[in-house]
From Swiss-Prot:
Its main location: membrane. The keyword NAD does not apply. Pfam families: DUF441 (PF04284). It comes from Glaesserella parasuis serovar 5 (strain SH0165). It comes from the Bacteria. The chain crosses the membrane at residues 1-21, 27-46, 52-72, 82-102, 123-143. Keywords: Cell membrane, Membrane, Transmembrane, Transmembrane helix. One of its GO terms (cellular component) is plasma membrane. InterPro entries: UPF0756_TM (IPR007382). The keyword Zinc does not apply. This is UPF0756 membrane protein HAPS_1649. It is found in: Cell membrane. The lineage of its organism: Bacteria, Pseudomonadati, Pseudomonadota, Gammaproteobacteria, Pasteurellales. It is a multi-pass membrane protein.
Length: 150
């Protein structure tokens, strides 16, 4: 199998370099894995990754968020501790972000052309603002509110 020199491969190489330059391992590793998959026999699995990647990523992210509760590093708050303004705002923020993420998934499925812009914005945020790549779903949810689509 020979190497494929196409615009996607060049973009992935650019993302790897951007990830290294910005010291963001999430971008570097993600782009490297996808480049390896694209350039090898693993390319046949890309459609499965495309179909189930977000769902698997959300599951892994949720496991990572819940792990400190299970390990005991973070104690489950007593009911009385839940009744303060910071905790209430945190709960509301969680509800809003989950709702926006749901709208974002729908928008990305219905208007896939917008995914490119969302990805570019997310990559810039991850690379230069030390963000994490959960942005596309929330960004798509916010975009759906702005353009009136879901």
């Amino acid at each position: 199998m020979s190497l494929q020199f196409n615009s996607v491969a060049l973009l992935l190489v650019a993302l790897i370099l951007l990830g290294i330059f910005s010291q963001n391992s999430a971008v570097t590793i993600s782009a490297a894995v996808l480049l390896i998959m694209q350039q090898t026999l693993l390319s046949k699995y890309v459609p499965y990754l495309e179909q189930y990647g977000i769902k698997i990523g959300i599951i892994i992210l949720t496991i990572g968020v819940l792990a400190p509760l299970v390990s005991g590093r973070i104690a489950l708050p007593e009911l009385v501790q839940l009744i303060n303004w910071k905790m209430i705002v945190a709960i509301i923020a969680g509800i809003v972000v989950a709702w926006l993420g749901g709208r974002g998934v729908t928008l990305m499925g219905n208007q896939p052309v917008l995914v490119t812009g969302l990805l570019i914005g997310t990559i810039i945020g991850v690379a230069f603002l030390k963000g994490v790549p959960v942005g596309p779903l929330i960004a798509a949810g916010i975009l759906s509110l702005i353009i009136g689509k879901s």
